[in-house]
């Protein structure tokens, strides 16, 4: 009997797929970036609930992109919308990390 993947595992897979897709395009810039999933952001930033965050490398800590699962799942109205939103959040955070526009990071950004 096949095991059913949890929603959390399926969400993690979406983040990994987006990270791999972008790492293929930006190999030199994203090779050492750590992509993570956390359930919720650490706190409110005054501008609403964050869907993701990024942090530059500091010392021996690698640069990282984090996607917050529960806020993304709350906003997505379907599985397809969730997949699109996850990818958009990953693209936005990578763009912020690299100092680029999201459309430069992924020309398909925002087209879905």
Language-model features, listed with the residues they occupy:
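A short, surface-exposed helix-loop junction/capping segment
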Residues: 1-6
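Active-site beta-strand/loop microenvironment that shapes enzyme catalytic pockets
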Residues: 90
């Amino acid at each position: 009997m096949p095991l059913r993947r949890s929603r959390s595992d399926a969400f993690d897979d979406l983040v990994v797929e987006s990270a791999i897709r972008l790492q293929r395009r930006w190999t030199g810039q994203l090779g050492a970036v750590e992509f993570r999933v956390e359930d919720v952001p650490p706190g409110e930033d005054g501008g609403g609930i964050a869907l993701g965050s990024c942090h530059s490398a500091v010392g021996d800590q690698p640069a990282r992109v984090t996607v917050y699962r529960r806020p993304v799942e709350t906003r997505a109205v379907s599985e397809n919308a969730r997949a699109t939103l996850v990818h958009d959040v990953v693209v936005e955070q990578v763009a912020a990390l690299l100092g680029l526009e999201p459309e430069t990071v992924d020309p398909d950004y925002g087209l879905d």
